[in-house]
């Protein structure tokens, strides 16, 4: 009997089972213990293969692929700390709903807790963060293939959102020629190999329950809060809110077109808050809200009813309002709860939104971070997509820009970390083959610098704008101790990214004014390659501009 041959047949069943659940992208890191899984994936023509030498980046690459494809994405890594490096992406997927299938190779049980090399306690190591966890036994012909395939099917059928961790122990030898070992075991699955359906088909329907009193509530004074959603959903939500005559507070990830722009500015005005207090119901569609003033208002508003609608399970309301938590796809929920044409009830808020927008426009000529956030709409590629980083940049875009309705926008706003942002953006581009604009800060770029290797393989123009304000300038917005701010919070690195781009053979520009930026972008959008554009800006100007605008708008 050949152990290596049977390992591969066992792995082939696992990988083939994944194809029956929509898995097309497989992300693979190098490793020896994962050889059975890697070879099974490599030999399966149903898969598109992606490779990366860094498991943390690999997990985020898969996250980006899943965001756009809306299908589960598989990740294959070897044993040991390689597995632990998947933790950040797994956590993010659990909070934002992307389906990741983490296939982690492992040592067999007799090599755990005995000093064996690269052997750690992997089973259950991710605690409660995966939505589903499956610890497979060591491959053996004593276990029928139908058990293995039905176990995979069951786990995937139960996976509504988030990650499935499948721990896969393999004994040595891991290498060797294929022979007939396990062939009969594998063939007992019969014509399943030629079929395209799961061995075990389980139905888990997610249906939106119609709220019987909706016809009552839609006649009241309401507010619509739009969080993270798809581009198609964003356009529908904008039309729905307009028909109802309810003000729409749109997050940067809502893709609603933010009909009342600069919400994070005018929500700091007492007149706006007073008018919103008249709302009898708040309907929040989507989660992961960005704006600080929006979150502050959400925490203090007290409507008669607060409804949260999202495809992801859980409360999703840090303010713990009295109301309803409805698990449903946003588009399906809107269809069941049609709007009734009514006149807008808010008067002050549209006026304040227009005045806030005018204040922002008045400062657009200065070459700086806040102005880039405002201008970002002008730089979006046609028929393309936008990936927004975390920390200060996403807050500036949320507060100062107005993105087109239905234009695809992606970000990692679940745990809102700055790790893996370049890798996620690379996955977003690969899944769509669209021209992509990504914008991150300098520390975010440094954190995921080796992901520039992924940008050597793009299928359409990709522009990475690195806003270099020399450190974590978001802390300039917080009451951090002045004497300790630079060393312990901002941590300026005093670096530039030209050598990093050159190391990975990427195009690079460092414009010093808007004309040079626009010229660099024009050239980049004509080339199916990646371009790094570094904007070196005054370190505190972005944060100070935001604070100045907040003060101005609060007194309108």
Swiss-Prot record:
Keyword terms of this UniProt record: Magnesium, Manganese, Menaquinone biosynthesis, Metal-binding, Thiamine pyrophosphate, Transferase
Pathway: Quinol/quinone metabolism; 1,4-dihydroxy-2-naphthoate biosynthesis; 1,4-dihydroxy-2-naphthoate from chorismate: step 2/7; Quinol/quinone metabolism; menaquinone biosynthesis
Pfam families: TPP_enzyme_C, TPP_enzyme_M_2, TPP_enzyme_N
Reaction equations catalysed: isochorismate + 2-oxoglutarate + H(+) = 5-enolpyruvoyl-6-hydroxy-2-succinyl-cyclohex-3-ene-1-carboxylate + CO2
Record field: transmembrane: none
Keyword presence, Metal-binding: yes
Cofactor mode of binding and number, as noted: Binds 1 thiamine pyrophosphate per subunit.
Quaternary structure (record): Homodimer.
Protein name from the UniProt record: 2-succinyl-5-enolpyruvyl-6-hydroxy-3-cyclohexene-1-carboxylate synthase
